[in-house]
């Protein structure tokens, strides 16, 4: 049985690529045709790739691999947080901060600081500080929650990065490749399939397309970990 059907992908608009002038020739094998100056993705190829991605991701989850979902564009931000939470993955959905992977020691210190501030807030310790000092601490807390909130349970580097927009998240791609962390990537027609281990050719701009693909990948992670793909709020990343 197919992980995702052609009808589902058509309905989600997963077949719409970018304008032909913006294409990457390396994506040619995944392109069906050009229509009105826009490349149309071959959804038969997408279905095959999605089946492979599902099996690969499920196998990785079954062997205890930890996942990081990355997607900071407006269309992906909410979906990334929801689907990552559903399968117990960590996530970045606001802005990729330089060194999130390659400077992990420093990043972990910032995450620890976030946890400390959250404890202070919940215990009332911040409220007991002088007004000005309390305001400074709350601003720091809000900033750290915005950018690092999805990483609180990531105690070490991820084993797999799941990516929504390769071009936008180029720094994440560079850092993952530098550390030999495999990438499962949604690839629009302007992307480079050579920069990921598990390609999924599809529209990475439409909310429904992003939701469909990430939803299935979250299902694969839950199935690998729990033997079922309907888990909610799966295990936290260790």
From Swiss-Prot:
Keyword Ribosomal protein: yes
Family annotation (Pfam families): Ribosomal_S2
Keyword match Transferase: no
GO biological process, one term: translation
Annotated GO CC locations: cytosolic small ribosomal subunit
Keyword field: Ribonucleoprotein, Ribosomal protein
GO molecular function, one term: structural constituent of ribosome
InterPro entries: Ribosomal_uS2, Ribosomal_uS2_bac/mit/plastid, Ribosomal_uS2_CS, Ribosomal_uS2_flav_dom_sf
Matches recorded under CDD domains: RPS2
Family to which this protein belongs: Belongs to the universal ribosomal protein uS2 family.
Protein name: Small ribosomal subunit protein uS2
């Amino acid at each position: 049985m197919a992980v995702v059907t052609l009808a589902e992908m058509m309905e989600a608009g997963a077949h719409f690529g970018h304008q032909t002038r913006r294409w990457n020739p390396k994506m040619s094998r995944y392109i069906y045709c050009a229509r009105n100056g826009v490349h149309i993705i071959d959804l038969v190829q997408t279905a095959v790739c999605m089946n492979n991605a599902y099996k690969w991701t499920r196998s990785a989850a079954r062997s205890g691999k930890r996942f990081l979902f990355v997607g900071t564009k407006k269309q992906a931000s909410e979906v990334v947080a929801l689907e990552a939470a559903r399968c117990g993955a960590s996530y970045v959905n606001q802005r990729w901060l330089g060194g999130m992977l390659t400077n992990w020691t420093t990043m972990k210190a910032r995450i620890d600081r976030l946890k400390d501030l959250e404890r202070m807030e919940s215990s009332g310790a911040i409220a007991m500080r002088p007004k000005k000092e309390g305001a400074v601490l709350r601003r720091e807390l809000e900033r750290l929650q915005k950018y690092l909130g999805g990483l609180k349970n990531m105690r070490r580097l991820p084993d797999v990065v799941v990516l929504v927009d390769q071009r936008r998240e180029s720094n994440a791609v560079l850092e993952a490749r530098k550390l030999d962390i495999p990438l499962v990537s949604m690839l629009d027609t302007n992307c480079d399939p050579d920069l990921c281990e598990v390609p999924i050719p599809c529209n990475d701009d439409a909310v429904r397309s992003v939701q469909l693909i990430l939803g299935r990948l979250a299902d694969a992670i839950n199935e690998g970990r729990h033997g079922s793909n309907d888990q909610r709020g799966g295990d936290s990343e260790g």
